Amino acid sequence: MRFRQLLPLFGALFALYIIWGSTYFVIRIGVESWPPLMMAGVRFLAAGILLLAFLLLRGHKLPPLRPLLNAALIGLLLLAVGNGMVTVAEHQNVPSGIAAVVVATVPLFTLCFSRLFGIKTRKLEWVGIAIGLAGIIMLNSGGNLSGNPWGAILILIGSISWAFGSVYGSRITLPVGMMAGAIEMLAAGVVLMIASMIAGEKLTALPSLSGFLAVGYLALFGSIIAINAYMYLIRNVSPALATSYAYVNPVVAVLLGTGLGGETLSKIEWLALGVIVFAVVLVTLGKYLFPAKPVVAPVIQDASSE
């Protein structure tokens, strides 16, 4: 029974670790033939429309106004700002691996916001995050950190927005189930398309086949599947656990680079992979391996009863 209860958790984490880890590489392919804000907007609009149509055909109804607006706000924070900044940065020639490294700061910001919101955090989570960040540094110590610094700043801003949205999203009422993801993607898509028009983005030529395939992959797998998995996590587990994917994503990005891009890894970088996986185990399984001890409140007798 215990294993069956954990299946949704493991499935959601797998979607985030593997699918989102590959999106950095796919975004880089897409922005070669799409303007960045436009590509992100098309991605989320397509995903949101498809998911909403599916839900409405299945008999689901639109949520009340308050949860709907809450979901739109979370979509703005997580997708329009969080993911949009990554897309713009990669268009500015920030390497996908560097993008993944900067996004790895999300769990650190998440724990900080968690403390501000009064959410209890475990010492083991802090230890896991510290080890994970150390692994990220090791992973890139032998690489070429020649990415655009302004692009890195954009990703950092997106990471802060994503972390705040993750914590805030766990404290407010959101639509039930996949309806939350549909509204968030629609809202983000609209905002990104407006931003694209304001920025004066235009298609100078028809995107290539790889560009269309990249948007399709990002819409279906990177948005509909992975984002709904993420929303499941932030509603059901601690924010630190929900953002632990940030440790695995750089690993997946590096493996894609070695497998498809002809890159090589040094010994210290391979060692870093093991350190990062260990950190993920601490963050994701620590609450089950080392559950918090229940606090027994002392019994205080009422003086009037004596």
From Swiss-Prot:
NCBIfam families, per the entry: 2A78, PRK11272.1
Gene expressing this chain: yedA
Cytoplasmic compartment residues: 1-6, 58-67, 115-125, 170-173, 228-239, 291-306
Single biological process term from Gene Ontology: response to toxic substance
Sorted UniProt keywords: Cell inner membrane, Cell membrane, Membrane, Repeat, Transmembrane, Transmembrane helix, Transport
SUPFAM superfamilies: Multidrug resistance efflux transporter EmrE (SSF103481)
Domain of life: Bacteria
Bilayer-spanning residue ranges: 7-27, 37-57, 68-88, 94-114, 126-146, 149-169, 174-194, 207-227, 240-260, 270-290
EamA domain ranges (all copies): 18-141, 160-285
Membrane-protein topology: Multi-pass membrane protein
Main location, first listed in the record: membrane
Location(s) in or outside the cell: Cell inner membrane
Protein name per its UniProtKB record: Uncharacterized inner membrane transporter YedA
Family membership noted in the UniProt record: Belongs to the EamA transporter family.
Pfam name, any one: EamA
Keyword Membrane: yes
GO cellular component: plasma membrane
Periplasmic topology ranges: 28-36, 89-93, 147-148, 195-206, 261-269
